[in-house]
Structure formats: structure tokens, C-alpha cells
Amino acid sequence: MPYFINKKKERIRYKSIKGKGPGIIFIHGLNSDMSGKKALSLERFARKNKLRFIRFECRGHGKSDGKFEDFTISDWKKDLIDIIDNIAKGQQILVGSSMGGWLMFLAAKARPRRIAGLIGLAAAPDYIDGFYKKLPLKKKQEMKKKGIIKYSSYGFSYLIKKKYIVDGRKNKILNKEFKWNRPLILIQGLKDNVVTPDVPEKIVKKIKGKQIQIKLLKNSDHRLSNLFDLKIINDSIQSIIKN
């Protein structure tokens, strides 16, 4: 697969397919990559419908350059914008999974004219506040003293630096209202134990627009990767294209 080389000479792995517009860009979640079920399902959908499609890996994820702990939300936002500016053609539908949903909103605010619509899959904007609040006091003290901690969650362990927390707070989008006059669809599983089902409502309270939908899936979890979930995602893209 090809790599985009950024201004720091760091490689960002991506895959793109040609087709008609609007294009689709899939943005993976924290500590994930571009090879999951949702990304591959979207690629199949794009091929079937002859649509442009891109999936990529933020630095510190998958086979892109760098160590996870060396990057922040600002860095990953820059990766997405680099893909939009240098690889994508024309208008795009951004599909953001979990953390990718946060990056999706940040990119939409930075490049509004390039975005045809947004689809959040268990979107988790501003999640760092909640993450830090839930950290045990011992871990908070360790981070203050050493500037880095080892964190384990849902079977994964990774290093987190203090700058990750500080930078995340600088990138909050729900601290004030903003207008979005294009389609926004938030898809949320009611059995999600990572991003709670009340998050979509918090999001739409801060985003002002007339084309905003929330789709609650009763039997779906955070992964949103079963056949029913994938069909809902594909149908949502189709509805934005028809719109």
C-alpha cells in the first residue's frame, strides 16, 4: 500500500480507490487501524457503487510511522487534513469511528467546503476529559511526576504522555456551539460500554443544523461491526449522496 510523506518526512499509510464523488474517507479509532471490518465494508460499498474511497492510518497506528505515545489529537487531526488536502479529490463524506469521530469534527471545521457530510460511529469528541477523570489518583500522580503512564483498557495496554491530555483539552469541540449546515448522522449502539449512549445527544446540543440525525441501535456495541450495523452505515452514506 502507498504512503503519504508529510512535511516532517513521516509516512502515513493509506489506500485509495478511484470513482465518482462525493468520496468517502474512513477515520479509525484510538489504537486501531485501517484494516477493521468497518473500513473493509466501506471499501466494498464504495467499489460496488463506483465511489472514491480512502482509508488510512494516523501516525503511531498500524503501519504508519511513529510510536503511539509520541502523538496527540492535534497530530492526528493534521494527518486527516493532510489526506484531505493531498490525496482526496473533491468533496468528501467523513466516516469517523470513536476517536475518529472527534477528528472528523475537527477536520470539518478546518475544511468545511470540502465536506459533503459527516457520519459518526460511536463518535467520541472531547473524550479525554472523561478519560482523565476516571484515571486512578495514583496514575494522575504518576503522570504529574513522570509525564507518562502505562494505561490498560479493554485488553489493550499503551503509554500515554501528559501532552496527550493537555493537547486534547485544547481541541475540544463541545465547549461552544457551532453551525453545521450539511448532513450529520450519528450512529450509536445502546450496548456500547466505551462511548455511552447519551453522547450523541450531548453532541447535537452543541451543533446547530437542520440535517442532523441520531440512529440508536438497540443490540449493537462499540464496534458497530455486525452485518446489521454495517448495513446501517452503508444506508447512511447512500442517504447523504442522494441528499
Regions found by a protein language model. Give the residues of each.
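Short alpha-helix in the alpha/beta-hydrolase fold that links the catalytic acid
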Residues: 39, 182, 196-205
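Hydrolase active-site cap/lid region
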Residues: 113-160
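Short beta-strand/loop motif that positions the catalytic acidic residue
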Residues: 180, 186-188, 192
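Acidic catalytic loop of the alpha/beta-hydrolase fold
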Residues: 191-195, 222-223
